[in-house]
Amino acid sequence: MARFFQPKKHSTLDTKHQPVTIERLDHQGSGLAFLHKKPLFVDGALPGEEVLIQLTENKSKYARGQLIKVLKPSAERVAPFCAHYAQCGGCDLQHLDRAGQIHHKQQALSQLMVKFAGQSLALSAPVCSDDQGYRRRARLSLMWDKKTQQLQLGFRRKQSKAIVNVTDCPVLEPSLNALLPDLNALLSEWSQPERLGHVELVKGDNTRVLVLRHLGALIEQDQQRLTDFASQNQLTLYLMLEAGELQHVQGEAPYCEETGSRLSFLPSHFIQVNRAVNQHMVAQALNWLEVSPQEHVLDLFCGLGNFTLPLAKQAQAVVGVEGVDEMVQHATHNAKLNQINNVAFYQANLEQDMTSASWAQQKFAKVLLDPARAGAEGIVDQLSALGAKRVVYVSCNPATLARDSQSLLSQGFRLEKLGMLDMFPHTSHLESMALFVKKG
């Protein structure tokens, strides 16, 4: 039978402006409406608002629309405090007041736990901080625009790879924010601007850190101007080479004083962005674990010892386990720095079976987990075998927390407490803490 060519059908996008009513926010902070019974996502729209939209995407199961005009605003709508908010992709909830942001994040956490773990629980009080000047580290992109012959220093534009030039970031720690105009001016006069990669700014308790990612060797003139800038501003300066290695140029090694312990770190190490929330988070985790002086505690995904060292002040002994060997070495250094002798750190791939590891033979009634966004798949299935009776799970991804909760519930744990940690105000990103207790 002959087969004839048939052109593919192309669905035309209706670009007329259309009014819709926003029902709620989705977990990413976009307004959710329904257009012909199909979910429609609208960035910048709030629950209860009547808005005018233009379709930008129309799939079989969902659609996306651009907010054209707010016809009937929500009482929770506020004017963004940042001049770059409309373009910058760093924040996505500045148009929603703080109470509304916190309510939305708590609601999102509750809904995910009900949907994927079948757990409904009244949330503990949220852990919050000041909503401006809270970021103690940031990575800013650098791009040389050949057409305009100008350097762009800032953050990615919303849903784009383009750079929004930023000279003021109100959520950045004030002493870091103050560097932006002069840093932009310095790098705009760079001899080879096309070789600039990115800049990282970090606020330690003893110093501010500047890291410059540069492709290829610096010429002497640029190197001198950079070191002069660091000296004038009393900065610790690092260069990041093409292989990703850090080269310390000048200044003190940075550290943070966290919950009574001094944590030395390198700019490549993970530290929590929001110092105030981190301190409250650590205190709450210790309170929920209820550690006694006779107990051995296990800290999984321990990093530099953010939880490990405070735990060691309450327990008989603490074991910290981390996947990155360099972090293990630095955590061990931090324990010595703080004269804490009842901790031991180990490197291990926590996706594998750990029950036969030497450190696992101690058995631990109390366990703390603080995994990355991928969650604790692998090790979470082994907690009952490790002797756990009480588990605090700190999560930066509620979806993987909900998934891992299913494993804990199947091992005979019950979810006793659940709370939201507002580590990143004015963004839809939420962190959370859950307490699981072994039944019986």
Swiss-Prot record:
Pfam families: TRAM, tRNA_U5-meth_tr. The active site is at C396 (nucleophile). GO terms for molecular function: 4 iron, 4 sulfur cluster binding; iron ion binding; RNA binding; rRNA (uridine-C5-)-methyltransferase activity. The keyword rRNA-binding does not apply. GO terms for biological process: rRNA base methylation. It catalyses: uridine(1939) in 23S rRNA + S-adenosyl-L-methionine = 5-methyluridine(1939) in 23S rRNA + S-adenosyl-L-homocysteine + H(+). Keywords: 4Fe-4S, Iron, Iron-sulfur, Metal-binding, Methyltransferase, rRNA processing, S-adenosyl-L-methionine, Transferase. S-adenosyl-L-methionine binds at Q272, F301, N306, E322, N349, D370. [4Fe-4S] cluster binds at C82, C88, C91, C169. InterPro entries: 23S_rRNA_MeTrfase_RlmD, MeTrfase_TrmA_AS, MeTrfase_TrmA_CS, NA-bd_OB-fold, SAM-dependent_MTases_sf, TRAM_dom, U5_MeTrfase_fam. Residues 11-69 form the TRAM domain. Its EC number is 2.1.1.190. Coiled coil: none annotated. It is an enzyme of class 2 (transferase). HAMAP family: 23SrRNA_methyltr_RlmD. Catalyzes the formation of 5-methyl-uridine at position 1939 (m5U1939) in 23S rRNA. Belongs to the class I-like SAM-binding methyltransferase superfamily. RNA M5U methyltransferase family. RlmD subfamily. This is 23S rRNA (uracil(1939)-C(5))-methyltransferase RlmD. It comes from Vibrio cholerae serotype O1 (strain ATCC 39541 / Classical Ogawa 395 / O395).
